[in-house]
Amino acid sequence: MKATHNTLTHFSKKGNAFMARFLRRQRHQQLPQSLQILNPRRLFSPSRRAFRWLLITLTFIAVVPPVFFHFRLRHFHQMQLKKCDWLNDPPFVCAHGGDSINAFPNTMDAYRSAIHSQADCIEIDVSRSLDGVLFALHDRDLQQISGNSSSKVGHLSMKEIKGLGAAHRVDHKSNDQEIPTVEEALTFVSNSVTQVILDAKVGPPMYEKGLAKDILSVVQRTRCKNCLVWAKSDNLVRDIIRLSSDVTVGYIVMVDPKTGIRNNLLRIKKAKVVGVYHPLIDGKLVSILRRRNKKVYSWTVDDEDLMRKMLYEGIDAIVTSDPTSLRVVMQEVRTQCLEDGFSVQR
């Protein structure tokens, strides 16, 4: 009997609880729709998943843009440094044969025009005549003057070369279009520029024999303290190094026309300058040569876009046939860098 009473009591409690929940549900369903919407528990109790996504979104908005702009700013500074750092140590503007865009190469007119364009240095071609006189002349220029595509400076005597120069002067109606000797050229330009490059050409009939001695002799006679001698012939470069410790010497890096392979970058230890054919120049090459305390000169750069590229590579000198255009490009880049906020170190 007692067990039956307990069972009834249990069912009675469960029934009461069920009825209470039922009545609460009924009251809630009878609330106006507007009050149900404003129910605080519905309004302020988002699901955990929604809350998590909201938190992730807010974190993304707070963190990603500053990081993005930080890296963009860093990239901008790196690009600006690459583009503008040369302003702290500008390269020499080296006039190839003088201003050979506006005058015939290696003539007094070309040298005078280069000096007027504020070139820092002038490159003079050095070739030896049949009778051993050094002329400021390249074989290709002799061929143009003579009209003979096979002419070489070493095939002609001093008198013959001077005769061709006189005829060339008459054709151009200028007293400064004749062919100068290297001594005449050095006397004219060496005190007007920071550096003179003597680009020594090896040719018949004696080739390298005695050429280093002849070049050093004219350097000494003209007292050219700012002369740099370089050549494509490593034998000649080594001869000059062996005979004199006072003259700055360089060697040439280019692609061997026979093998298609670039010359060894570090092949002459005592040479202080390396003249590099401009398509070969990049940051890695410049870094390698700088680590060996060698200056990097590019040749021959006449295109304005390539001039800019050489500036960005931070080399020491740019050899060009058009020094005026190079000066204009340098000024344009300088102006843009300063407008972008680059600070030149003093």
Regions found by a protein language model. Give the residues of each.
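Phosphate-group recognition and catalysis centered on beta-loop-alpha active-site segments
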Residues: 2-346
